[in-house]
């Protein structure tokens, strides 16, 4: 039967008997939960948003509870718990590898992790106050890579496509590909541990002095500042083989032989160095985290990005030739490399690319749930992910209550509070604030799924002001100066500003900005003239579309600068966290639903935008 979510979020089916599947990513980075009802996504959220620890590992207790509460389901109504790991996968390969190499660390850490997976029925049962035997009867393990593949394929708009996942590794696999035909997803090929493009990127990220889990984004942002003059040296770290395969030169890496400390406990995941002293002998001494970034570090980042792209396109070109498909669904942590994604259509035979917003391990909960749904006889596909808003929302009453609780704090900072009755006039007023050079925290509707803020938990600013990048990086986000900002653009105006760009509501592809427009939108133009765009349509996010439309009416520019609503923490989830972040930083305006907090204006004049766009 057809499924719809009632205003409470409660899912109802015309046929009466609903199938409720909960997907879970646990004991890995970016733990999360997702809920499907009769094959349609109802809710999805990452545990880091509740726990306030980036990439949190462990078990997604709060995410799981929220998904069920949102849909009005009791834990006993869950038909399947789908977990995106399979401790039994590739056991012979693992045993052979352990016998041959006797590694000290990594694999032993993973073995401990697998023992946690075995106790998962008890953990789920105690989390939801269910009988463990009941959970055990309803638990399905879905291997890590098939979960990645399913997370992209089954929510894509394609009936037929090639599907590929590239990441660090999970369940002993680092790369896999296959094909989607309707409800059927087949895996054709896998590349196994210890060979991994994700691990190559991680090793050089660590070498460049970015030690935190998830810091690869920083290196991708740094790369356009340098020339890839070390590419030949980095090519010695791996060999590209026939049929899309590749091999690392393991003498440069330590992840396979042990000695790498990995923790996947109840907190931020940590990874010790995965490279050996031989890498420093090849490239020179590593950068310490407290040392300044120098020209040769920029060149190394550029070289890594170039070699990663060559290797990824080596895989993808083989996938395209063997599947003969013009469409690609891409997943895995490496699918978050938006710079490479923007070149896929130019450097492979693929014409259409789909990446869902939680392409990393966070999305495997979604994938495991869809894999289980589509393993059912007669299951049909009638869901396409067109937006990312699958998390919690808060009504104006809840927002008002939080504002009352914090009234003393914002009075101290000379902030005024107003509640608007008309959303359209509030959007027009907000657009005028942006055009006047003010930085706006924008909090609307359901929170985004995945690691990008896409207009519901965003910090917004005027893209015409060249100084805006430094203002936000240094005054609000407190992060590295070289990090770029993204343009959110009205879908219907895309070709005016970008060269060869595709529609992408999830901000996962970087494209060149037209040379004549770069001076018009300097704050969202990266050093190489590119922008990681988000297309905004009236259908997928009507409120955000109306705001950008209002900004366009004032300025002639159909774009706002969009960055995630956070300051060295996960993206804000609740109105209280949004108000805290607003008060802690130097944002000028906060719009939550139809409530506005506004700082008293400083008397210093705002610099003028670089250029106004002529229509």
Predicted features and spans:
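N-terminal cofactor/phosphate-binding cores enriched in small/glycine residues
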Residues: 20-91
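Flexible beta->alpha loop and helix N-cap segments adjacent to enzyme active/binding sites
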Residues: 27-46, 51-54, 94-97, 102-106, ...
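Feature for intrinsically disordered/low-complexity regulatory segments and propeptides
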Residues: 115-117
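Nucleotide/phosphate-binding catalytic cleft detector across ATP-hydrolyzing
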Residues: 12-14, 149
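Phosphate/ATP-binding catalytic cores across multiple sugar-kinase/actin-like superfamilies
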Residues: 302-328
């Amino acid at each position: 039967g057809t499924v719809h979510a009632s205003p409470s979020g409660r899912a109802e089916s015309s046929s009466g008997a609903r199938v409720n599947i909960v997907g879970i990513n646990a004991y890995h980075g970016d733990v999360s939960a997702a809920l499907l009802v009769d094959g349609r996504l109802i809710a999805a959220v990452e545990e880091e948003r509740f726990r306030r620890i980036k990439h949190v590992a462990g078990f997604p207790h709060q995410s799981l509870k929220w998904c069920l509460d949102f849909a009005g389901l009791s834990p006993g109504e869950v038909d399947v718990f789908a977990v995106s790991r399979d401790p039994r996968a590739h056991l012979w390969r693992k045993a052979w590898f352990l016998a041959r190499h006797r590694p000290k660390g990594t694999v032993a850490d993973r073995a401990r992790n697998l023992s946690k997976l075995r106790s998962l029925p008890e953990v789920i049962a105690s989390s939801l106050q269910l009988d463990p035997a009941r959970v055990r009867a309803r638990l399905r393990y879905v291997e890590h890579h098939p979960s990645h593949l399913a997370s992209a394929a089954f929510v894509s708009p394609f009936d037929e496509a090639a599907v590929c996942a590239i990441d660090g590794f999970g369940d002993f696999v680092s790369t896999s590909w296959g094909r989607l035909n309707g409800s059927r997803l087949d895996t054709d090929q896998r590349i196994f541990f210890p060979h991994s493009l994700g691990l190559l990127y991680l090793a050089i990220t660590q070498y460049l002095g970015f030690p935190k889990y998830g810091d690869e984004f920083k290196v991708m942002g740094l790369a356009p500042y340098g020339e890839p003059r070390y590419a030949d040296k980095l090519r010695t770290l791996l060999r590209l083989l026939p049929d899309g395969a590749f091999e690392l030169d393991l003498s440069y890496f330590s992840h396979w032989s042990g000695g790498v400390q990995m923790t996947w406990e109840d907190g931020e995941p940590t990874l010790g160095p995965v490279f050996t002293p031989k890498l420093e002998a090849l490239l020179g001494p590593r950068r310490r985290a407290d040392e300044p970034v120098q020209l040769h570090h920029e060149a190394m980042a550029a070289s890594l990005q170039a070699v990663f792209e060559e290797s990824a396109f080596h895989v993808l070109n083989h996938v395209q030739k063997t599947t003969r498909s013009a469409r690609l669904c891409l997943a895995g942590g490496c699918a978050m490399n938006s710079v490479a994604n923007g070149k896929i259509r130019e450097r492979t035979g693929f014409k259409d690319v789909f990446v869902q917003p939680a392409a990393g391990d966070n999305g495997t909960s979604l994938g495991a749930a869809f894999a289980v749904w589509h393993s059912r006889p007669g299951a049909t596909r009638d869901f396409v992910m067109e937006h990312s808003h699958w998390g919690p929302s808060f009504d104006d009453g809840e927002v008002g209550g939080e504002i009352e609780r914090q009234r003393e704090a914002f009075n101290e900072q000379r902030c005024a509070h107003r509640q608007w009755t008309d959303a359209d006039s509030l959007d027009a007023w907000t657009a005028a604030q942006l055009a006047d050079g003010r930085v706006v925290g924008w909090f609307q509707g359901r929170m985004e799924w995945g690691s990008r803020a896409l207009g519901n938990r965003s910090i917004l600013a005027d893209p015409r002001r060249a100084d805006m990048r430094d203002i936000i990086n240094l005054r609000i986000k407190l992060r590295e100066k070289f990090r770029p900002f993204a343009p959110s653009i009205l879908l219907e105006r895309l070709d005016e500003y970008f060269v060869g760009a595709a529609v992408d509501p999830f901000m996962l592809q970087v494209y060149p900005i037209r040379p004549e427009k770069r001076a018009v939108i300097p704050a969202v133009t990266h050093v190489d003239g590119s922008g990681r765009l988000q297309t905004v349509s009236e259908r997928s996010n009507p409120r955000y579309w109306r705001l950008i439309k209002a900004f366009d009416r004032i300025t002639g520019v159909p774009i706002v600068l969009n960055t995630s609503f956070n300051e060295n923490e996960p993206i804000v989830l609740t109105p209280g966290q949004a108000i805290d972040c607003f008060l802690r930083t130097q944002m000028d305006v906060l719009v939550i639903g139809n409530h506005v907090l506004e700082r008293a204006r400083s008397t210093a004049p705002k610099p003028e935008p670089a250029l106004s766009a002529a229509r």
